[in-house]
A protein has these predicted regions:
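Short, acidic, metal-binding catalytic loop of nucleotide-sugar glycosyltransferases
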Residues: 51-63
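Active-site-proximal specificity loops/subdomain of glycosyltransferases
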Residues: 67-108
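Catalytic core and acceptor-binding pocket of nucleotide-sugar-dependent glycosyltransferases
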Residues: 164, 173-258
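Long, compositionally biased intrinsically disordered regions
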Residues: 244-245, 249-278
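Conserved catalytic core of nucleotide-sugar-dependent glycosyltransferases
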Residues: 121, 125-203
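Short beta-strand-to-loop acidic/aromatic patch adjacent to the donor-nucleotide binding site
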Residues: 109-119
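N-proximal low-complexity "stem/linker" segments adjacent to membrane-targeting elements
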Residues: 1-50
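Short, hydrophobic beta-strand segments that form beta-sheet elements in well-ordered domains
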Residues: 39-42, 61-69
């Protein structure tokens, strides 16, 4: 497997001893001591990350900033925000927020999260806040992704999307213990209970979040659906931009190099009514 896949959250070929992850997570937990409402954001562009920090703080949560090694730590860290180098123990060439998200139970009682390319109206931020703060331990919230119309009945392709959401320690621990969490190829999870179950899971789509849908549908997990229409408007992604430009056309996406190439954060903020936070 391409080594870069490990940092994206991929159980197939995952080679890092779990003991090493647990040790690293103890440091992440120490970094969040006294933080009741952490909200994970991922630095790929300083202006976008700064605006995300302000949005999070506006609703009374604490920005917890991780970052892709290709971009590095944020230049702007607002007072009260927390920066964590989730890659410090591993030295991976690429790291996505999926990596720490899979192990949320190790370092936080409750962890909100969203994409690095997502901005929201203040009205939406308050709706998300209310959902997140209303979660009981053992439950989580995320955006369901059932795919296009042709996939609506292909149940094994359905997944939950980490576009925006929140997990609790109990939910994250349940997913890890049962081997059905956020990462790709959840059939390769070390806690998959037996070979028969592994064969069952191998029939499912490989992508991230399929394990979360499986956890809900087959393992009794509690997931509160976040309506996609809440967040579609401010999701600045290649999916919604026909003339999206890649740094390496046809190659691996590099959001840190492409987000400012394709979207003007000032214009997006204006459209969402949050220019006052720039």
């Amino acid at each position: 497997m391409d080594p870069s896949q490990i940092g994206k959250g991929n159980w197939k070929g995952f080679s890092i001893p779990l003991a090493d992850v647990f040790e690293a997570a103890s440091e992440w937990r120490d970094s969040l001591a006294g933080v009741d409402r952490p909200w994970l954001c991922w630095n790929v562009s300083d202006r976008w990350c700064t605006l995300q920090q302000r949005l999070i703080q506006e609703v009374g949560w604490t920005p917890v900033i991780g970052y892709d090694p290709r971009c590095g730590p944020p230049k702007t860290v607002l007072p009260g925000s927390v920066v964590i180098d989730f890659n410090a123990h591993f030295g991976l060439e690429i790291m996505w927020p999926h990596f720490p998200l899979e192990f949320a139970f190790l370092f936080s009682d409750r962890l909100a999260f969203w994409h690095a390319d997502l901005l929201c109206r203040m009205e939406t931020m308050h709706k998300l806040k209310d959902v997140f703060e209303g979660l009981q331990d053992g439950a989580m919230a995320a955006v369901p992704d059932l795919g296009s119309r042709r996939h609506i009945y292909r149940l094994r392709h359905h997944r939950y999307w980490e576009l925006a959401g929140c997990t609790t320690r109990g939910a994250s621990k349940s997913q890890f213990d049962q081997g059905a969490g956020w990462w790709r190829f959840f059939d390769h999870h070390p806690n998959c209970p037996n070979e028969k179950e592994r064969r069952r899971r191998a029939k499912y789509y490989y992508d991230s979040g399929v394990g979360i849908m499986y956890w809900k549908r087959r393992l009794g997990g509690q997931v509160v659906n976040i309506p996609r229409q809440w967040v579609d408007e401010g999701h600045c992604t290649s999916i919604s931009k026909k003339n999206y430009r890649q740094v390496q056309p046809g190659g691996q996406r590099n959001l840190s190099a492409e987000i400012d190439l394709n979207f003007d954060v000032t214009e997006v903020a204006k459209q969402l009514g949050i220019s006052h936070l720039l």
